[in-house]
Curated annotation (Swiss-Prot):
GO terms for biological process: mRNA processing; P-body assembly; positive regulation of gene expression; RNA splicing; stress granule assembly. CDD domains: LSm14_N. GO terms for cellular component: cytoplasm; endoplasmic reticulum; mitotic spindle; mitotic spindle midzone; P granule; P-body; pericentriolar material; ribonucleoprotein complex. This is Protein LSM14 homolog car-1. A motif (TFG box) lies at residues 251-271. Residues 101-125, 312-325 have a biased composition (Low complexity). A motif (FFD box) lies at residues 227-243. Keywords: mRNA processing, mRNA splicing, Nucleus, RNA-binding, Spliceosome, Transcription, Transcription regulation. Pfam families: FDF, LSM14. Belongs to the LSM14 family. PANTHER family: SCD6 PROTEIN-RELATED, TRAILER HITCH, ISOFORM H. The keyword RNA-binding applies. Residues 101-148, 277-340 are annotated as: Disordered.
Length: 340
């Protein structure tokens, strides 16, 4: 910080590694900590630069923001400060630190320039901000910004009075909250012996108030359970069987009417109709099978005659009694059949 930077007071535009652009006036550069401090800073956001997390611009103007040099992607000097004359009419010269001149008569009430006045546009070496910047050390990882870009910045009024105080309604991070509740104060230690004596007195008083009488309760005779098993009767006498049901008039045939009423109450009228339909269809199927079996029997009976058409048509249709090919069993009686 001994050497003054020639761009102090210039308007700077820098872009961080998150592609966020900031504009402000260069206040100081710390080469030891590799930090740059800007005053009157405004954030313009990412400005349509390709980034994973776009950030919108903000209209807020922050008094001071300190940036870490390693996290700055680009830096541009927009405007340099104008050369101002130093006291006494001397031109601006970085080699001049202070100027002393003769005191002029204070006709208009303005104070005269005192000896040792600092150069215009350059901060004092012992300014509070310079001391704060020199004492800053980079933190572990991340973006160490002591004056972060949010609304919780100090209201700068003529200096850094109060450090990080006077924030706009935000709590100081890292500062524990003060509990304003009043703590109980005890004049002396708690006496356990006195407390036990009071407890014993209260317990004795409560016991004296109780009326305890020894009353013997009458003994209640236990009722004996009746025998649940009679050896005289057999275990199998009450089991249902066909002989008992016949003796009582019960038959082994199911009562389809009662069963239908029970099914209708349980499953509904449509379910009972579907059950009847399935039962009837099965009966017709069985009848058809029997008919098909009869056809097979007839067909087999027809083919028992190896002779030809005579026996087959005579058995089924009742026609063609004459003519045709005679069976093999009747070859000896062919002439007799022709005579008839």
């Amino acid at each position: 910080m001994s050497n003054q930077t020639p761009y102090i007071g210039s308007k700077i535009s820098l872009i961080s590694k998150l592609d966020i652009r900031y504009e402000g006036i260069l206040y100081t550069v710390d080469t030891n900590d590799s930090t740059i401090a800007l005053a009157k800073v405004r954030s313009f956001g990412t400005e349509k630069r390709p980034t994973a997390n776009p950030v919108a611009a903000r209209d807020d103007v922050y008094e001071y923001i300190i940036f870490k040099a390693s996290d700055i992607k680009d830096l541009i000097v927009c405007d340099t400060p104008k050369m101002a004359n130093i006291g006494g009419g001397l031109p601006y010269d970085p080699a001049i630190i202070s100027v002393s001149s003769r005191s002029a008569p204070a006709s208009d009430g303005a104070p005269a320039a005192s000896a040792g006045s600092s150069r215009a546009g350059t901060p004092s070496r012992n300014s509070p901000l310079g001391q704060i910047i020199q004492n800053q050390r980079p933190g572990r990882g991340g973006y160490q910004q002591n004056f972060q870009a949010n609304r919780g910045y100090n209201n700068y009024r003529g200096g850094f009075a109060g450090g990080y105080n006077n924030q706009r309604g935000h709590n100081n991070y890292g500062v524990p909250r003060v509990n304003h509740r009043e703590k109980l104060k005890f004049e002396s230690d708690f006496d356990f012996e006195k407390a036990n004596e009071k407890f014993q007195e209260v317990l004795v008083d409560n016991l004296e108030k109780l009326n305890i009488e020894d009353k013997a309760e009458p003994e209640v005779e236990e009722k004996k359970d009746a025998a649940f098993y009679d050896k005289k009767t057999s275990f199998f006498d009450n089991i249902s069987c066909e002989s008992l049901e016949k003796a009582e008039g019960k038959t082994g045939r199911p009562d389809w009417k009662k069963e239908r009423e029970t099914n209708q109450e349980t499953f509904g009228h449509n379910a009972v109709r579907s059950l009847n339909y399935r039962r009837g269809f099965g009966g017709r199927g069985r009848g058809g099978n029997r008919g098909y079996g009869g056809y097979n029997n007839g067909y087999q009976h027809q083919h028992q005659h190896r002779g030809g058409y005579n026996g087959g048509y005579r058995q089924n249709n009742g026609g063609y009694r004459r003519g045709g090919y005679a069976p093999r069993d009747n070859q000896g009686n062919t002439a007799a059949a022709a005579e008839q």
